[in-house]
């Protein structure tokens, strides 16, 4: 099995719902985005073209982050996903430097530490972040998802790296990654690239797919088909 993803740019509306769903599902800290995007604006008024390409870990066949990791923290699982054993991460950032896509993040500070602030924004008028955290019964952030902790630390610790896992904890339960289910236009499909009958394989066969930075030779498993269709003319 080789899990991969197809993103149909013609269906994508650039809403960012995938990124919001990812942050909610995976408890990522401020400024850390497992699901992100490349947005470009071309042309001059009144003929302007806007393009939006969602990005995430490509779970490459020949993942450079796995090759350079000195402890084996970055590794491949039986589905071909590029995963990380956070307990073995020493924070050396070699994986970050090796990744040609810039999709690996580093926790330079303790994640979600703003929720440990016990000062009220408005004295006697609002609760403090810490008070709100305690009222929800959460440990790190009020909207934390404990299910993320099934296969990976629920909150990744300071001085470790982290990245998209294709929501492996959801895959284990037969569910799609959060970004796939959240997409309002169903632009994302995940499936087995080794199965010629899978939807991802059929889409790749039907359309001429694109991969990000193919010249890097990493064998990315995220494929893009068709083109983002927003063009504004006044």
Swiss-Prot record:
Where, by residue number, does [4Fe-4S] cluster 1 bind? 12, 15, 18, 183
Highest classification ranks of the organism = Bacteria, Pseudomonadati, Pseudomonadota, Gammaproteobacteria, Alteromonadales
The record's function comment reads:
Component of the arsenate respiratory reductase (Arr) complex, which catalyzes the reduction of arsenate (As(V)) to arsenite (As(III)). ArrB is probably the electron transfer subunit. The periplasmic localization of this complex may allow the cell to couple arsenate reduction to energy production before arsenate can be transported to the cell cytoplasm and enter the ars detoxification pathway, an energy-requiring process.
Under what conditions is it induced? The arrA-arrB operon is induced under anaerobic conditions in the presence of nanomolar concentrations of arsenite or low micromolar concentrations of arsenate. Expression is repressed under aerobic conditions and in the presence of nitrate. The peak of expression occurs during the exponential phase of growth.
The protein here is known as Arsenate respiratory reductase iron-sulfur subunit ArrB
Lineage top rank: taxon:
Bacteria
What is written in the cofactor note of this entry?
Answer: Binds 4 [4Fe-4S] cluster.
User: Assembly and interactions?
Assistant: Heterodimer composed of one large subunit (ArrA) and one small subunit (ArrB).
The record, for NCBIfam families, names: arsenate_red_ArrB (NF041715)
Q: Which residues form the 4Fe-4S ferredoxin-type domain?
A: 3-32, 48-79, 80-109
Species of provenance: Shewanella sp. (strain ANA-3)
Task: Name any one Pfam family assigned in the record.
Answer: Fer4_11
* pH effect on activity, per entry: Optimum pH is 7.5.
């Amino acid at each position: 099995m080789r899990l991969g993803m197809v993103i149909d740019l013609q269906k994508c509306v650039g809403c960012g719902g995938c990124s919001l769903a990812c942050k909610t599902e995976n408890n990522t800290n401020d400024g850390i985005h497992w699901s992100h995007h490349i947005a470009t604006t071309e042309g001059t008024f009144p003929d302007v073209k806007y393009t939006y390409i969602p990005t995430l870990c490509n779970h490459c066949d020949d993942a450079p982050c796995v090759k350079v990791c000195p402890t084996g923290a970055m590794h491949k699982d039986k589905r071909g996903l590029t995963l990380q054993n956070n307990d073995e991460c020493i924070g050396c950032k070699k994986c970050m430097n090796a990744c040609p896509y810039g999709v690996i993040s580093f926790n330079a500070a303790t994640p979600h530490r703003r929720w440990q602030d016990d000062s009220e924004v408005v004295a006697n008028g609002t609760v403090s972040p810490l008070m709100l955290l305690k009222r929800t019964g959460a440990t790190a952030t009020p909207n934390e998802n404990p299910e993320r902790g099934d296969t990976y630390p629920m909150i990744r610790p300071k001085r470790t790296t982290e990245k998209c896992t294709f929501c492996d904890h959801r895959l284990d339960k037969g569910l799609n990654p959060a970004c796939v289910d959240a997409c309002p236009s169903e632009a994302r499909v995940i499936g087995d690239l080794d199965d010629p009958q899978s939807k991802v394989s059929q889409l790749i066969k039907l359309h001429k797919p694109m991969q990000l930075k193919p010249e890097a030779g990493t064998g990315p498993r995220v494929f893009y088909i068709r083109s983002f269709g927003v063009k504004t003319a006044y």
